[in-house]
Amino acid sequence: MIFDHYAAEVALLLSDVRIGDLLEVAAGSGAVTRVLAASMPEHVSITATDLNQAMIDRAIKVGTARSVQWQQADVMDLSFSDASFDVVVCQFGAMFFEPKSDAFAEVFRVLRPGGQFLFSVWNSIDVNDFAREVIRSLAEYFPGNPPTFFERVPHGYHNRQIIGNDLAEGGFTSIPVLEEKSFTSRAPTALHLATAFCMGTPLRSEIEQRYQGDLGDVVNFVSASVERRFGSSNLEGKMSATFVNLKK
């Protein structure tokens, strides 16, 4: 629903990498990993990591077009030697790192001189249609105590000056290239979208803290709001993110 376009964009931005060692951090269930495994030359070794072993197990089960080294790893304390990789990639994970400068310092450490760091972050919730409508409807459902996770975390790290400062604190001295990319996100039904956001993301825990009844009640309310805004099926909405690209 939201990751495929950006995974393809990662592969495009790395299309000039023909040989070397690539590390992906916060790989999740492997959306980017699968695209890279299918598009990168065999001479580029791929190591994909995530903090959550369950996510790695899921990614392994789905499989990749060629061999990938999967490993559980914490980006705050990577188990790799200094100067081990030519490229480090992270799609939609940097927003969760805390403190971010420490994570960037680890990336800097494992990169070889001249190595490339490419990561993406979501832009403001105001320019991400589906997320904005979900949050708006939840604020209506929980007046006075709306869930704030999406605005604080996934859509809370897009200030270019702050990103640049965090990278500098992590040791990077080159000027990052920041490029905004917008695509159309699609969902088969309003219910599918509401379920994905409310049940399949950390937003669920915020809902559970506020409602002890059947979570289906909340999902149905959000679904109805989404349907009024986007229709009941074949939904389309704008999504917007920024790619940050720099060298060590």
Residue ranges of each PLM-predicted region?
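Conserved alpha-helix/loop element of class I SAM-dependent methyltransferases that forms part
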Residues: I2-G20
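A structural alpha-helix within SAM-dependent methyltransferase catalytic domains
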Residues: A11, R34-A37, F104-F108, I135
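Conserved Class I S-adenosyl-L-methionine
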Residues: S29-A31, P154-K248
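A short SAM/SAH-binding and catalytic strip from SAM-dependent methyltransferases
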Residues: D86-K100, N123
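A short glycine-rich, Lys/Arg-flanked "PGG" loop and its adjoining helix->strand segment in the class I
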Residues: S101-Q116
